[in-house]
A protein has these predicted regions:
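N-terminal membrane topogenesis motif
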Residues: 1-28, 81-84, 88, 117, ...
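Membrane-interface junctions at transmembrane-helix termini in multi-pass inner-membrane proteins
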Residues: 12, 69-78, 129-156, 167, ...
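Hydrophobic alpha-helical transmembrane segments
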Residues: 118-125, 151-190
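Alpha-helical transmembrane segments and their helix-entry boundary regions
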Residues: 14, 18, 45-46, 69, ...
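Short membrane-interface helical motifs at transmembrane helix boundaries
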Residues: 96-114
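Alpha-helical transmembrane segments of multipass membrane proteins
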Residues: 30-35, 136-140, 162-167
């Protein structure tokens, strides 16, 4: 006798996999936040928040949001071409933003009202590129229905970010928040 299979069982399983991964990835930083608030100053968090905001805004434009289109094509080849396009656009945008930031670094940091961000503005283009690649691969993995891998990537990113935040913070380096964020995302992207 055939076992009754709900048409939603695969969907439910995939959704639960993603929900579990996302939940674990969010629990990790919440769990260590009491420690991190003692290792990093409010000023360190301010510079980090400003850095993340700049990267998020530039990332929204860098790839032209073409990563959203990776899911749409019927043919795998077309989706792969869109994936490649997002990489090229992100690379070109990052190179242009590096030039702009190199020329106007001091002016930008003055407009932002934070002199400490000036040295981190040079890192922004690389972070934008990394963010675009990470998002593009996430959509690609979603298209390939690799939900366990997506969930694992989120947990790995969160875990590596948290552990490097702790390690660098214990060393007394305020820049650890930014570096750890980049480290966690680069590990999850590979």
């Amino acid at each position: 006798m055939k076992k009754f299979q709900s048409p939603f069982s695969e969907f439910t399983s995939n959704a639960l996999t993603l929900i579990t991964g996302t939940t674990l990835a969010q629990v990790i930083p919440v769990a260590i936040s009491p420690i991190l608030t003692r290792l990093y100053s409010p000023e360190d968090y301010g510079v980090f928040a400003l850095f993340v905001s700049i990267v998020a805004i530039l990332s929204a434009f860098a790839s032209g949001k073409y990563e959203l289109a990776i899911m749409l094509p019927r043919r795998e080849r077309d989706a792969a071409n869109i994936l490649g396009l997002t990489f090229v656009l992100a690379m070109v945008s990052s190179a242009i933003s590096l030039g702009v930031l190199a020329i106007f670094n001091e002016s930008i940091s003055q407009v932002l009202g934070n002199e400490k961000i000036a040295k981190w503005l040079y890192v922004v283009p690389g972070a934008v590129f990394l963010n675009c690649v990470f998002l593009s691969f996430s959509y690609w993995e979603n298209r390939q229905k690799r939900y366990k891998r997506l969930a694992l990537n989120r947990v790995v990113q969160s875990g590596f970010t948290a552990s490097s935040n702790l390690g660098i913070g214990l060393g007394g380096y305020g820049w650890g928040l930014i570096l750890s964020s980049l480290f966690g995302q680069s590990v999850a992207t590979t």
